[in-house]
Amino acid sequence: MLSIRLALLGPPGVGKGTYSSILSKELRIPHLSTGELLRREISMKTELGREVESYVSRGLLVPDKIVNDIVAKRLCASDCANGFILDGYPRTLPQAVFLEEYFPLDKVVLLQASLETIIERICGRLYCPNCGETYHVSWKPPKRDNICDKCGVKLTRRTDDSPEVVKRRYEEYLATVSPVVDFYKKLGKLVPFRAEGDSQILAYSLLRELSSSRTEILVEK
């Protein structure tokens, strides 16, 4: 049986979700989003979920130990036995060290894009407040300006989808991820990948790149 353990790192708006979803489908392993895992714990009102909510409600970062515990619980599930794709984790060096000790990865993909590209992607996003459909002014525009194709409701933008906020988040990401990148580079597990362009098309290029080194990332169990 083949086992593949991957993590995707990258700044907000680089397309981690799109890449992860396609790789998950093609490799037949679960795509695990840290944000979704945290929200699930909150919605289920678990002990960990209550701890997470106590930090999130105050606008604070959730401590590494709590995030590690939630991720570890999910990775122990039976559907992760043959591999998984982590999206948005590890974010910090302590998280990476924890993961390497208990659930060592085969490869860590570093999705890279310029600040200009990230600003264009994020600031061009449009959302339907009624049905949740998403659009983009450049590559997925609605048929009528600012009107949802599905339900006819006026589209909106997120308040934090501004160039100033995106730039600040991008710089915060670079400062936080740098030790994690160095950690996996030293382990020989880092796969830098230029994510400039159509995420759907590039995801399959990434898949081919990973498959070309399958002897390194696919381990016979």
What are the roles of these predicted feature ranges?
Residues 1-221:
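Glycine-rich phosphate-binding loop of ATP-dependent small-molecule kinases
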